C-alpha cells in the first residue's frame, strides 16, 4: 500500500472522528474543499506551506492571517498540526480521503457525467433522481464535464459502472459502420 495513502487515511480518519463528535462534519468538509480549491488556484501558497526552508512558525502565522476567523477551530488546528508535524505536503491526499470517508458515511455516490453541452438545472435534477434509484444512494454528487467529441448524448460513470448514451458510442458500436 502506498505510504502517502496510509498517512492521508490516518489523518483523514482522525479529523473525521473529531468533526463527527463535535457535529461539525458538514462545515469541516466544506472548509477542506474550499482550502483545497484555494491552494490549487494559488500553487505558490501551497509551495510556501510545504517548503522545508521556511520555519513552521512563519507558516503557522501565515495560516492564521490568511484564514483569520474564516475557519472552524477544528479545521484551523488541524492545519496547524499538519504544519507542525510536517504533514502539510499530504493535504490534498488527506482531503481526498476525508471526502471518501464522508461519502461512505453519508451514502453519497459521486457520478461523472460527460455531455456535449452544459446540462440545465432541470436536467441535472432529473439525472440525480434517476441515479439515486440506480445506485440506491441517499445523495448524488455530479461531476460535470463538457466533451464535444461525444457528438450528442451522455456518458455516465459511477463506481465501476459506465453507461454510454452518447451518439459517438452508438456509432462506434453500430454493426453498420
Swiss-Prot record:
<keyword id="KW-0793">Thylakoid</keyword>
<comment type="similarity">
    <text>Belongs to the ATPase delta chain family.</text>
</comment>
<dbReference type="InterPro" id="IPR000711">
    <property type="entry name" value="ATPase_OSCP/dsu"/>
</dbReference>
<dbReference type="GO" id="GO:0046933">
    <property type="term" value="F:proton-transporting ATP synthase activity, rotational mechanism"/>
</dbReference>
<keyword id="KW-0934">Plastid</keyword>
<comment type="subunit">
    <text>F-type ATPases have 2 components, F(1) - the catalytic core - and F(0) - the membrane proton channel. F(1) has five subunits: alpha(3), beta(3), gamma(1), delta(1), epsilon(1). CF(0) has four main subunits: a(1), b(1), b'(1) and c(10-14). The alpha and beta chains form an alternating ring which encloses part of the gamma chain. F(1) is attached to F(0) by a central stalk formed by the gamma and epsilon chains, while a peripheral stalk is formed by the delta, b and b' chains.</text>
</comment>
<protein>
    <recommendedName>
        <fullName>ATP synthase subunit delta, chloroplastic</fullName>
    </recommendedName>
</protein>
<comment type="function">
    <text>F(1)F(0) ATP synthase produces ATP from ADP in the presence of a proton or sodium gradient. F-type ATPases consist of two structural domains, F(1) containing the extramembraneous catalytic core and F(0) containing the membrane proton channel, linked together by a central stalk and a peripheral stalk. During catalysis, ATP synthesis in the catalytic domain of F(1) is coupled via a rotary mechanism of the central stalk subunits to proton translocation.</text>
</comment>
<keyword id="KW-0139">CF(1)</keyword>
<keyword id="KW-0375">Hydrogen ion transport</keyword>
<keyword id="KW-0406">Ion transport</keyword>
<keyword id="KW-0150">Chloroplast</keyword>
<dbReference type="InterPro" id="IPR020781">
    <property type="entry name" value="ATPase_OSCP/d_CS"/>
</dbReference>
<keyword id="KW-0066">ATP synthesis</keyword>
<comment type="function">
    <text>This protein is part of the stalk that links CF(0) to CF(1). It either transmits conformational changes from CF(0) to CF(1) or is implicated in proton conduction.</text>
</comment>
<dbReference type="GO" id="GO:0009535">
    <property type="term" value="C:chloroplast thylakoid membrane"/>
</dbReference>
<dbReference type="Pfam" id="PF00213">
    <property type="entry name" value="OSCP"/>
</dbReference>
<dbReference type="GO" id="GO:0045259">
    <property type="term" value="C:proton-transporting ATP synthase complex"/>
</dbReference>
<keyword id="KW-0472">Membrane</keyword>
<keyword id="KW-0813">Transport</keyword>
<dbReference type="InterPro" id="IPR026015">
    <property type="entry name" value="ATP_synth_OSCP/delta_N_sf"/>
</dbReference>
